[in-house]
Amino acid sequence: MSPSIYRANPSSEGYTYTKKDGLVTGLNTYGVIQPERKIRHGEENKVWDAIVIGAGYAGLVAARDLVKAGKKTLLVEARDRIGGRTWSAEVDGTTYEMGGTWVSHNHGRLFSEMQRYGLKDDVSVTRTEGGGCDYFTLDTGSGSRKLTHKEAGDMTANAWNIFINWDGKMGRDICPLPHSTLGNIRVNPEKVKEVDKLTCRDRIEQIKHLLSADELALLESIVPHIGGGAVEDMGFLGMICAQALQNYEIATFEEVWTLYKIREGQSALARRIFDDAVRLGLQYTFKSPVKSITDKDGIVSVETTASKTYRARRVVNTLPITCLPDIRFDPPLSPLRQEAIKINQLDYLTKCHAEVEGDLRGLRGCTWPGDLLYVYGDGFCAGGKSTRITSFAGDNRGKLDPIKEPEKLETALQRFHPMKIKKVLWHDWVSDPYAKAGAAWYPANFLTKYLAELQSRHGNVLMANADWASGWRGFIEGAMEQGAIAADTVLNEVGNVGANPAPGEYQRSSRI
């Protein structure tokens, strides 16, 4: 498929800041669907086989799999676009990933979707070897220094390996099966609970005497870069899981986490899944926030804030943990799940992009402490005369509000390297009412107590979100895992018509 088959329509989401125009709301994306509602006449009040709430990757995969099996399915989405916390904006010919971004062959479900829709080779890379400003800047508060990428990489690797080596085997003993972290045949659950008691700060305090000042600064910044929260609260067990998922090697961190992107943007893949589902019969309604879910007498009623009610035999709810308190469930959620939701998650990240003049494609950098922690030169913008810059921070609540003080993003970016900034772009996930945060990272003592409950069903409502995936929690891969599993469950219960006759329909042969 060519990107020209899609038109980038305006979304109400996303922000652009320039000194000339100030703050402007709304960005164009392939993820905006027109018309915004498609429900066949006379079918609005019927009982659907399934309703899928949320059009992120979990919801898209679930909806596609359900309609592909012939199930009458309605997709209900609060936003004006598909993608949830993963979407790409098209600005002046350049694609900007506003949320989830990178892909890897380690992400099996995601890669299979890329293969399915002809995108397996349609990738670009964030890092440009030999690009302009081909070095790493490190600013730990006493001025910026230039390091080679190898020097910075070696320091980061040494710090990470000391930090993560809790079991003396780089995580292999405590997490041999990262998709079954909390219960498998090789690890005593009590040992896992012991690790889950640790915050990342606890672990840093245990090993910081083994690190140089620069190594400590790099570790203090990469931890919130990974999890989006404060090291004082972030659970260390999640870091062990991340280590296992990247094959127990810091050497693969870039390849798995921050290197390969879909050339056309994540919204191009999301759009392919959505279009496939619509071709197969999916019906949908956008700008339809849900306010209540009622499960009674085998039928689930979903009511929107506009007082529209839709009914189905099963519901796949893909809302993130941060948004579950906004929904009234009847019957109420279990006390244990409510307890987990009250504690909630920690990823209050800031992610922004900038278009800067000249060639900064080779730039990498870290500032600690800083309003932004990491920066990546991210290829040329359209036209080849300016560079796309991507930057991340952890929990900046109370310190940096990019909507109220967007000029502070420019100031923070200048700490990495002198830049002539043409524009800054971002999605403010913390103020987004349908996200309220980034992809989940949990505090200590959370996963071993609450993960299984978050994954469990609530009557005829299946809960499916990357926030409680078994493997790649918080990743696109985890969202696809959850959506596919939920769809399979619905099909097994609502009925999946296969190629073989139902039991009892075989005719016995007169001769054997």
Positions of PLM-derived features:
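Active-site/ligand-binding neighborhood in enzyme catalytic cores
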Residues: 180-289, 318, 328
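N-terminal Rossmann-like FAD-binding beta1-loop-alpha1 element of flavoenzymes
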Residues: 45-75
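Conserved flavin/dinucleotide-binding core of flavoenzymes
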Residues: 2-36, 299, 365-512
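A conserved short coil-to-beta-strand element within the FAD-binding core of flavoproteins
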Residues: 286-300
